[in-house]
Each structure stands twice: as C-alpha cells, then as structure tokens.
Amino acid sequence: MHTRTVFFISDGTGITAETFGNAILAQFDIKPRHVRLPFIDTEDKAHQAVRRINHTAELEGKKPIVFTTLVNMSVLRIIQENCQGMLLDMFGTFIRPLEGELGIKSLHRVGRFADVSLSKEYTDRIEAINFSLDHDDGQSHRDLSGADVILVGVSRSGKTPTSLYLAMQCGLKVANYPLIPEDFERKQLPPALEPHRKKIFGLTILPERLSQIRNERRPGSKYADLANCRHEVAEAEAMMRRSGIRWLSTTTKSIEEIATTILQEVRPERLVY
C-alpha cells in the first residue's frame, strides 16, 4: 500500500478541507499521514506552512499532497508559488466557476463559521447536544415530547454515536434507550416510550459483530457471549416488528449513513434547508 503525507491547510478550522480531501483520498489504496494546519490566516503563517511542506518533501522524497481552503489570496499565493507539494485548491476550483454562473463576486470571507455563535442555528445545535446528552442511554424520561427522534436498540448497537452525530450535525434533539431483558420479557417497548411511538427508530446489528464489540468492553462475560447476543438481537427485532417501528442494521454502515437514513425516514424535511 502506498503511503503519502497529506496536508490540509485552511484559514479556518481545516475541517472542510479535511472532510473533502478524505472523501477524495478514499478512492485510492493509500495509507495517508494526515497533517492539519488550521488558522493559516497571515503571510507569516503561510511561509511557516510552506517550510513544513517542503521539509516533508525533502525528507520523504515524495511530493506531499496539499488540500487548501484558503480565501485570502495573498496567503494562497504564497502557498501556490513556494510549496513543493501537489496543490489542490478546493475553493479556487469551485468559487471562480460559481462567480461566473451567479454573476456576482464571492465574499471571500475567512472562516465558514464566522459569527456563527450569534446565530439561531448555533443556539439550536447547542440545545440539541445538551438534550441528547441528558437523554443518552435511557438516563431521563423527561420532556420526551420535545425529542425529534428516539432511538432504540440493544446495548452497543450504535445509538449513542448516532444520537450525538444527529445533534451536532443536524441540530436534532435525540433520545436513545437500550432494549434490555426486562423489555424482552414483557414483549413491549419501555412504557415511557409508548406515547411517542411515531418518533421511534430502531437500530440492530449482526450478533457476531455485537459479540465482538461487547468483548472489547467486557471480555468473556455473558453480556458479550455470542448466544446471548443472538437472543437479544432476535428479541429486539421481533419487538420492533410487532410495534411497527422502522429500523435498520448498523453492522456495515458508517455513522453518517445511519444518520442520513434516519433523516430520510423520520425527518425528511431536514434534508432541505
């Protein structure tokens, strides 16, 4: 497998450059070494970044790959004219054609989160994160009427990371509840969830994968035993079918794929904004 150092340079956090760059790199069978250089917003910082890139090129004998999301043209020019890496200017690639199509100049505003802390979207997102943390793993039954989505599934099926992703990325208030042996004995959902059935979405997972995950946490326990995992998954899926709950398997899906599927099923309007 090929290895290569990849730089993500931005005058903001670098998250956009890294996300976009990783999506492209995933198409190649390489093992990249990631270096994120955020807040490169002055010419002095640009020269420092160039020195680091060029040192890496000399040390490794290969051109580093450099993804940039820089809106300050003087900073970008220093990188373009001096770095010994393969430069992929993401903003330049898309902004100039868009300026031509829209017939207006871009704002060239540094940092896509400028003034975000004052926006309603930001406030709503913080509230969603707090709600999801308070309602993680069945900790609280309060204010379930305020939930956008309620996730259910056996322990370690992916409920918590999915809840937090939906809160942080989509601003959704998400509660999640583990289905436990007492629920299986009653053959019913937890009583607190019944009034909110329309908001419920189920997560399941292959027993073999569940056993593997649980063994990392509690090796050799009944909790992680494959037979027990098979029993819990079968009972949970049967309960979801009886209750008419929509559900999916998380076994081979990323958090992003799980969250998008839930949005499509439960809150499709949130895909349009």
Curated annotation (Swiss-Prot):
It comes from Paracidovorax citrulli (strain AAC00-1) (Acidovorax citrulli). It catalyses: [pyruvate, water dikinase] + ADP = [pyruvate, water dikinase]-phosphate + AMP + H(+); [pyruvate, water dikinase]-phosphate + phosphate + H(+) = [pyruvate, water dikinase] + diphosphate. The keyword Iron-sulfur does not apply. ADP binds at residues 153-160. PANTHER family: PYRUVATE, PHOSPHATE DIKINASE REGULATORY PROTEIN 1, CHLOROPLASTIC (PTHR31756:SF3). One of its GO terms (molecular function) is phosphotransferase activity, phosphate group as acceptor. It comes from the Bacteria. InterPro entries: Kinase-pyrophosphorylase, PSRP. This is Putative phosphoenolpyruvate synthase regulatory protein. Belongs to the pyruvate, phosphate/water dikinase regulatory protein family. PSRP subfamily. Transmembrane segments: none annotated. Bifunctional serine/threonine kinase and phosphorylase involved in the regulation of the phosphoenolpyruvate synthase (PEPS) by catalyzing its phosphorylation/dephosphorylation. Its EC number is 2.7.11.33, 2.7.4.28. Keywords: Kinase, Nucleotide-binding, Serine/threonine-protein kinase, Transferase. It is an enzyme of class 2 (transferase). HAMAP family: PSRP (MF_01062). The keyword Membrane does not apply.
